[in-house]
Amino acid sequence: MSAPNCARKYDIARLSSLNFQISQYVYLSLISLTFIFSYFAVKIVHQKSIFQLSTKILLFHNLVSANLHQLLYLFSALRRLNLAYFYIDEPCVPLISEADCLPYLKVLVTGISGMIYGQTGLLLERGCATFIKDYDKKTSMFVGIAISIAILFLSLITGKIIIWDDPLQGYLLSCVSYPSQSVERSRLFASIYTFISSFNLVFSVLLRRYNKKLEYSTPFVVGPRFRKREVIDSTSTICFLTFVQFIFMFIYSFGIFTLKTIRSMLTYRQYYFIVVWFYTIPFIAALFPILLVYRIRSSHVSRVTIIKTFTKTKQTQEEHIKQLKNVWN
């Protein structure tokens, strides 16, 4: 029989499986992409984007949350691969006590919560930019900082709520797993995350439609039309990111729920062969900076192409006015 702080037979079987090891390398690749594209995302948002100051503050907050999760998950993936390659044949594969994992897990949950709540924060900020008439730089800064502080507070307390009153007397293979007495509460929060992502999706669709409708009611004057175009472009980008996050959160939540429902029909090996791929948070974290860079660059290229076409073509007055309208729309 294994000692309490040594891995059990099914933990060892999971570590030694090729499927599990491949999943860790996939996560490591996603983590590397997150770090690389986050650098480019910060650079392009700061220098070349049309985002307002409040949007930039919240985008940077989301990028920090994504990288925080990936950094901690990096340590976990490396530890598990280290155990799989160098400890698998040892008499005792060492586990970590739940108490020792507590600080690590709290920070990890802060990163996850920051990404989910951060997307809601971005949509609220876009709502403020849409409905506040005099959304100047000072107002934008106040909104961005206020929402960012609220997100940080909620993210910090989420981990404490999940692990609240847990005796922390067990042992874990890695610190990305929840303590045994907190598993049910963690599943509840996973469902809440999915609900929030669903709310974000609905809110983003309504907000985008409202902005599009409002654009057509804006008089064809260069200043107002340009500012409205900026709001629509930035809001469309946030809505796109929200949609992607919803898809992966739905896969995570619904996938885990389905597996738990049919758990009795699966062997231990079958269950863990599938469940390892339903943890989609590393995908969400990696796709955020990648898609952010893609959307900003594609928007820029589209505008440059239109302007070049516009300046090279000789037109009548009616054609000129028609193309102007197409540029703004």
UniProtKB/Swiss-Prot annotation:
The keyword Transmembrane applies. The chain crosses the membrane at residues 25-45, 57-77, 104-124, 143-163, 187-207, 237-257, 273-293. Keywords: Membrane, Transmembrane, Transmembrane helix. One of its GO terms (biological process) is detection of chemical stimulus involved in sensory perception. It is a multi-pass membrane protein. Signal peptide: none annotated. This is Serpentine receptor class alpha-7. The lineage of its organism: Eukaryota, Metazoa, Ecdysozoa, Nematoda, Chromadorea.
